Amino acid sequence: MAPVRRSAKWRPGGIEARGEGVSTVGYRNKNVRQKTWRPNHPQAFVGSVREGQGFAFRRKLKIQQSYKKLLRKEKKAQTSLESQFTDRYPDNLKHLYLAEEERHRKQARKVDHPLSEQVHQPLLEEQCSIDEPLFEDQCSFDQPQPEEQCIKTVNSFTIPKKNKKKTSNQKAQEEYEQIQAKRAAKKQEFERRKQEREEAQRQYKKKKMEVFKILNKKTKKGQPNLNVQMEYLLQKIQEKC
């Protein structure tokens, strides 16, 4: 067994001899930085300057939320006012609604125009009726001329031409039919070109196969038949000439 080390207290004059006139304060490690003591006061807010996300950050978030809320309220009020005084159409159907409005506007203008012409119509009829007695004394062949002119002028004012315009639905239907016709024409053209290409490839392969069969002919000994090859070359030269 290993010898047991005796405790210092059993040594003669152990503790007393070691501690005579020596202070233990001077034996601290000077390389270790001493931690300063700070009282743990209760903080008024969560977080600190080093950790972040404290009082200033929470205040900033609160201000941002209030600002965004105010912007939403203003935007909502603005859209409600716009919806009262303006017509908002979807983007994909906007051109149809605008065309319909333009058509109604033109029709209203045409309706107002004939009304203003009808006001002048009685005046023209009165002029014609006044002019008739004056022309009765003249010759018979001169008499119908002013009446015809009056009738023509009255008819020209009273009978407006009715220009039947197409509705937006009819225009959309025509556009759709045109698009379908273009697509069908493109499809037919594609099919025609495809058939021509396949036919050309088939003819090319057939021709190549015939040439291969001619040039691949061999003699009984298994050697290439040069006579057949020379005949083929002469035939090609004659065709080119």
UniProtKB/Swiss-Prot annotation:
Residues 186-202 have a biased composition (Basic and acidic residues). GO terms for molecular function: RNA binding. Transmembrane segments: none annotated. InterPro entries: Fyv7/TAP26. It is found in: Nucleus. Ubiquitously expressed. In lung, expression is restricted to the alveolar epithelial cells. Its main location: nucleus. It holds the Pfam family rRNA_processing. It comes from the Eukaryota. One of its GO terms (cellular component) is nucleoplasm. Keywords: Nucleus, Transcription, Transcription regulation. Belongs to the TAP26 family. Component of the transcription complexes of the pulmonary surfactant-associated protein-B (SFTPB) and -C (SFTPC). Enhances homeobox protein Nkx-2.1-activated SFTPB and SFTPC promoter activities. Interacts with NKX2-1. This is Thyroid transcription factor 1-associated protein 26. It comes from Homo sapiens (Human).
